[in-house]
Amino acid sequence: MKNPSKRILAFIFAGFIGVTVRAQNLDVIGVTVLRMATTNLNGAGIRVAQPEANNGDNGSTNSWEVNPNNVAQPVVLFAYTSGLGASTSYPNSVGDWSSHADAVGNNFYGLPNGVATNVAHVDNYEGNYFFDSIISATPPPNINDPVVNQSFIFGSVPSQVTIAQQQQIDSDYDNYAAKYNTLFISGAGNSGPASGSVCPPATCYNGIGVGAYGTSASSVGPTEDNGRAKPDITAGGSPADLTSFSTPYVSGAAAVLMQAGLRGDGGDDTNSAADIRTVKALLLNGAVKPADWTNNPPSPLDPRYGAGVLNVFNSYKQLAGGQHGCIVSTTVSTGGAHPPTGAAGTVGVLSGWDFNTNTSGKLPLQFDAVNHYYFNVTNSVSNSTFTATLTLVWNRQQGQTSINDLNLFLYNCANSNLVACSTSLVDNVEYIFVPKLPQGRYDLQVWKAGGLDIVSASETYALAWEYFSELLKAAKSGPNISISWPVYPDGFILQAVTNLAPPAAWYTNNPAPVVTNNQNVVQLSATNANQFFRLWRP
């Protein structure tokens, strides 16, 4: 997050290499290919908010405002609010200009290299006013901004913020999110690499905590209060790899997905498609795993990367796969076994989502409940394997200090063996990643605990899934060789080598792919020497 010792350095980067780095970041996070494959997905119709901490520019003690000219947007797009009042003009008397706010805005909605360049409105708030007068107010007012970017922190836990204070901050944000369907996307902080360094408000249950990819400075989970998995996701940053500047990329992606959901790209149930639980599940499920990604079960996510590196194109394609309900719902005694049922139905797509409710028993009958999603994971290549990514998200309910216990299970239907599961007792995200899944029929289960101690009998959740097998093809094209692979899923790089004998020296200096008919295509000159190719996700 914002660090006074980095302020001048960030300004220099912004002035000299920021544009180039931002354009490269759009490639990495899937924005470039999304714009090639879709029409007008740019955040249109979505209102957003950007509360900012004082940056101290020009010696001001009230420096938090975006300068519209510096993000290439009109003044009419903005409203500015602080304890000194509100204004729709710029400059104004309620605050002063902030270079930090400009850098955040450029990644969020700025032209030309922001993610959501056509948002409907930006509410720019002074950070203390935003928390004191909106988030923690009684009752809190509805700002009507479904996406809120927060590139600030309250401080490190427990050295600057006590665990009790962190929990109160989390509750204030979670209550607001549950009440108004507002997605708070917050930087995790730059206190890494020590574990437990994620700072509020990125620690709240119902929001998304964002790390910075490519730096050891990014804060690392789990949370200090009860060991929850945070951050949820990462992205690169510009003008520096700090979470202040990675966070607005995720916020922009959320605005784009909400726009897509509301315009019907994910099906007729537009309210479910744009719900914050669905958007969060899709963002996490579309993330690309770094080579050293790992989690430590029962924690669902990597303590450094969360679900991985943001890729909004992958998330969009899963949204576009449509909403598909469970095949069958069953109940079992509390703590009882819940193998596949043998139901004949099948979810019709290997990439998609659902927004549903699971109801277990509390009183007078106590029982666990399971929603079953059956998939036939196959293709035309008999020996190929699949990569499965599965994400379950639900809210901490308004006014509650705890959460309902939901889990994810993946069973092989042929033998009822458990393939993988995610069973955290403290997280409201469950996550399964299986990189080499054999072909077959599988039962993906959303399980909800019953019993006397549950928060409520029913819980609404969002589920996103992706099963893919990346097929690399080669064909002769005149005097050349054409190498191709599907545009979706994104995040792969073509590598080549002339000799497979270890240690094989794979290289990546191939021509950039050209997208043709939803395929990445690379044209190479034919040679008499052996050449071997593979797809690699860095």
Residue ranges and their predicted role:
Residues D275, K280, N371-F375, F409-N415, ...:
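C-terminal edge strands of extracellular/lumenal beta-sandwich accessory domains
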Residues T401-N428, Y507:
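Surface-exposed beta-strand/loop patches in noncatalytic accessory domains
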